[in-house]
Curated annotation (Swiss-Prot):
Purpose of the protein: Catalyzes the hydrolytic deamination of adenosine and 2-deoxyadenosine.
Cofactor note (record): Binds 1 zinc ion per subunit.
Binding site for Zn(2+): H12, H14, H197, D278
GO CC list: cytosol
Keywords, sorted A to Z: Hydrolase, Metal-binding, Nucleotide metabolism, Zinc
Name under which the protein is recorded: Adenosine deaminase
Length: 332
């Protein structure tokens, strides 16, 4: 199912959406934070999906307990470190971990730049110990407004040499991309790549904004592109990568079921698209799960799965030399 000769990657993976339940429990008790449960078993439903949520905003509430326990920068570093361990244990050769520094900082008034530093330090520590390559993507959480996003951007740009790209995430309907035009001009001027959550809760127009105004060369989710033939044609022609997260789309009620997910329509249209986990801690999945459901629920062949796997490598925010090295590693 997963082709061992092709690098296995996960490009849309939220670091702050992947905090182990045991870690939440331990950090909560360590810092005297009142948790909504009296045991690990009772805590799980508060931080993991037990079925489907009504919408994206309800889904995102599951993440709130994951950041509520980040009481100091050591906790942030621990979570970042454990994310690398988790990714490596799932057999990933390469991962892009994305995080929102303000979202991680806000509950305990941590310094935003300090959060960025702690994430970088935690990831570096994990990479030193495990056979995996990791790049970081900063997030501006649009739900908190333009000023908070500016503060996030400042913290990220202070460490731009350790970050490969910037993302826009959060309430897509309430905070459209054009509110962040100036933010992303600074991102591009700094030489960072751009991806954006778009076409998930909102329609195709959100994706056009992400591409034409923000400068996105990749789109997170993008399921609603299928309603705009011109957009589908544009995505294919210009090789705009779609970071597809099928199980997450099901959990947020973005799609009703796997068999109606537009993944196949993207592939049939020649769009560059790969599989990702999104918030694996919330969805309680790994990347292998996504390949399994695409095969069993959507009827993809092993050859088609290999194409998706290869697409992920081609979409990755890395240099051509690093890409060649990643392929060479699997060829040994």
């Amino acid at each position: 199912m997963i082709d061992k000769t092709i690098p296995l990657v996960d490009l849309h993976r939220h670091l702050d959406g992947n905090v182990n339940v045991k870690t939440i429990w331990e950090l909560g008790h360590q810092h005297g934070i009142q948790l909504p449960a009296n045991s690990l078993e009772e805590l799980a439903p508060f931080v993991q999906i037990q079925g489907k949520e009504n919408n994206l905003v309800d889904f995102l509430k599951k993440l709130d307990w994951m950041v509520a326990v980040l009481a100091d920068l050591d906790a942030v570093k621990r979570v970042a470190y454990e994310n690398v361990i988790d990714a490596a244990s799932q057999g990933l050769d390469y991962a892009e971990l994305r995080f929102s520094p303000y979202y991680m900082a806000m509950n305990h008034n941590l310094p935003i730049e300090g959060v960025v530093e702690a994430v970088i330090d935690g990831v570096r520590a994990g990479v030193k110990e495990h056979d995996i390559s990791v790049n970081l993507i900063g997030i501006m959480s649009r739900s908190f407004g333009q000023e908070k996003c500016r503060l996030e951007l400042e913290g990220i740009l202070a460490h731009r040499d350790s970050i490969v790209a910037m993302d826009l995430a959060g309430d897509e309907l309430g905070f459209p991309g054009d509110l962040f035009t100036e933010h992303f001009k600074r991102v591009r001027d700094a030489g960072l790549q751009v991806t954006a959550h778009a076409g998930e809760a909102a329609g195709a127009e959100s994706m056009w904004q992400a591409i034409n105004i923000l400068g996105a060369t990749r789109i997170g989710h993008g399921v609603n592109a299928i309603h705009d033939p011109k957009l589908m044609e544009y995505l294919a022609k210009h090789r705009i990568g779609i970071e597809s997260c099928p199980t997450s789309n099901l959990h947020t009620s973005t799609v009703k079921d796997y068999d109606v997910h537009p993944l196949r329509k993207f592939m049939d249209a020649g769009v560059l698209i790969g599989l990702n986990t999104d918030d694996p801690g919330v969805s309680a999945i790994d990347i292998a799960h996504e390949y399994r459901v695409v095969k069993s629920e959507m009827g993809f062949s092993d050859s088609q799965l290999a194409t998706l796997q290869r697409n992920g490598v081609e979409m990755a925010f890395m240099s051509d030399s690093d890409r060649k090295a990643l392929y060479a590693k699997k060829a040994k």
